[in-house]
């Protein structure tokens, strides 16, 4: 919509008329940038996400989606020949692909629930994605004779994030990808009541593929109840796809450890870390760990950069 600023005064209406840029992805050849923009309608009280592609120098900006569906989180795949993205056209949020000009759209996943974020493995053979898992019994579950009851009995924390009642937890899933669809879906936190990524703001940036596509690093605060509510002590875990084993590499750190990223050669892992438990606004430091030192009896403690 048009942005109207009258009398050189920024108004709420003008702010709502501005598009909000979301996810950004650079093509493998570094020549193009795909990104999402959210537009808001005050009369309809809702937003709509569209995708754009432009040249890396800022020229030739073009909109590649124009519809009522929600398209978001563009990612270049298949050597830059396709753009993968999330779309709810099928009735739930799934991974789709299309050409960089917006043609030849195709649905890639048909997962039973909404997919909230995703990342293809470096070798393109697997898909890491985020989906909600039920962790709390609803009133109807506890009292099947009262199927329409909406009351909630709270006996413990954490029962709410801002405007959202806690009934589910986001879990990371790994699946095989053959270029057209997924199979052999595995919940990395199967049977665990924890969140990864962490609510309320965490997304796919809290998980990372190893360059060899054989491991996934993820952020998790493995606590529940009151301990979860008062603590910021999250950790970086590494999940081995071949063995199914998980290793905590930041157990000594007491504050937030988030957003892991592997070095291109897979020898190091970097992440953001806060020093103290319980302080959400503590200083974020950048840590780098030499992964070859993890299994030594007295590993070298990583120092902030």
Predicted regions and their residues:
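Surface loop/turn motifs at the tips and blade-to-blade linkers of beta-strand repeat domains
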Residues: 15-18, 65-68, 109-112, 189-190, ...
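Hydrophobic beta-strand positions that form the internal "hydrophobic ladder"
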Residues: 33, 80-84, 127-128, 216, ...
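Short glycine/acidic-enriched loop and turn motifs that connect beta-strands
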Residues: 39-43, 89-92, 134-137, 223-226, ...
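Predominantly five- to eight-bladed beta-propeller fold
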Residues: 49, 132-191, 219-222, 226-235, ...
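Single conserved hydrophobic/aromatic residue that forms the stacking wall/gate
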Residues: 294-305
């Amino acid at each position: 919509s048009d942005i109207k600023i009258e009398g050189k005064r920024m108004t709420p209406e003008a702010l709502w008329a501005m598009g909000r840029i979301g996810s950004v992805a650079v093509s493998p050849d570094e020549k193009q940038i795909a990104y999402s923009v959210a537009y808001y309608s005050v009369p309809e009280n809702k937003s709509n996400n569209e995708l754009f592609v432009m040249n890396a120098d800022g020229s030739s900006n073009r909109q590649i989606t124009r519809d009522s569906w929600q398209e978001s989180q563009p990612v270049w795949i298949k050597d830059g020949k396709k753009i993968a993205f999330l779309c709810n056209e099928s009735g739930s949020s799934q991974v789709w692909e299309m050409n960089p000009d917006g043609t030849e759209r195709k649905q890639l996943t048909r997962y039973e629930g909404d997919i909230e974020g995703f990342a293809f493995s470096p070798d393109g053979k697997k898909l890491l994605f985020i989906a909600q898992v039920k962790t709390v019994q609803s009133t109807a579950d506890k009292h099947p004779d009262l199927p329409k009851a909406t009351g909630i009995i709270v006996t413990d924390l954490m029962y709410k994030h801002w405007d959202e009642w806690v009934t589910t937890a986001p879990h990371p899933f790994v699946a095989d990808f053959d270029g057209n669809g997924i199979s052999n879906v595995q919940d990395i936190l199967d049977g665990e009541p924890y969140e990864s990524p962490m609510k309320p703001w965490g997304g796919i940036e809290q998980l990372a593929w190893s360059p060899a596509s054989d491991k996934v690093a993820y952020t998790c605060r493995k606590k529940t109840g009151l301990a979860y509510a008062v603590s910021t002590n999250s950790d970086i875990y590494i999940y081995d796809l071949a063995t199914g084993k998980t290793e905590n590499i930041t157990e000594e750190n007491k504050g937030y450890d988030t957003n892991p990223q592997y070095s291109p050669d897979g020898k190091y892992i970097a992440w953001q870390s806060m020093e103290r438990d319980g302080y959400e606004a503590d200083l974020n430091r950048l840590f780098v760990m030499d992964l070859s030192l993890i299994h030594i009896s007295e590993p070298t403690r990583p120092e902030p950069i």
